[in-house]
Regions:
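Thiol-based oxidoreductase modules, predominantly thioredoxin-like and allied folds used
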Residues: 22-23, 67-95
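Short active-site neighborhood of thiol/selenol oxidoreductases, capturing the structured segment around
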Residues: 36-50
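The canonical Cys-X-X-Cys-His
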Residues: 50-53, 113
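Bacterial Sec-dependent N-terminal signal peptides
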Residues: 1-21
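Typically the conserved alpha-helix immediately C-terminal to a functionally engaged Cys/Sec
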Residues: 54-69
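Hydrophobic beta-strand anchors of alpha/beta hydrolase catalytic cores
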Residues: 41-42, 76, 113
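A short beta-strand-turn-helix
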Residues: 24-40, 70
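Non-catalytic, surface beta->alpha helical segment in thiol-disulfide oxidoreductase systems
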Residues: 103, 107-143
């Protein structure tokens, strides 16, 4: 029993170490990208209904290879549009996400990844495709 509890705690804490550090304030994310001369990655996601979004999360965003590279090179921001009431963000976040969608994803594609330079200029777009985290990094860096 003690071994199971210890294993659970190790698993819980180690999974948190692999989780990407997604910014929650858009203005802070833009400022951090500029100050750190990092690419700004804006991700439009439907985390509880969009199957390609869920695959992108599992295959790329939470992968340790991607995370190790991203922490020094990217500032990540997610605008999530869940459908289930229990997953919906607060009203302020919903309004902010809607404004971001109007500016950067007016056609409403999901998942939709906007790659910007450190000054906030759009350099390219990606979506989901079955690829490795290493190849996804290469695609991002081509912009």
């Amino acid at each position: 029993m003690k071994k199971n509890g210890l294993f659970f705690l190790i698993l819980l804490f180690s999974s948190g170490l692999l989780a990407q550090d997604w910014r929650t304030n858009w203005d802070d994310a833009k400022s951090e990208a500029e100050k750190g001369n990092k690419k700004l990655i804006l991700v439009f996601s439907g985390s509880d209904w969009c199957i390609p979004c869920i695959k992108l999360e599992k295959e790329i965003w939470i992968n340790s290879t991607f995370n190790e590279y991203a922490k020094d090179n990217y500032v990540l921001f997610r605008a999530d549009f869940p459908k289930r009431k229990k997953n919906k963000p607060d009203n302020v976040t919903q309004k902010r996400n809607a404004m971001l969608a109007a500016d950067y994803n007016p056609k409403g594609y999901f998942p939709f990844v906007v790659i910007m330079d450190s000054q906030g200029n759009i350099r390219g777009f990606l979506g989901y495709e079955k690829t490795s985290p290493k190849d996804y990094i290469i695609q991002i860096n081509q912009f």
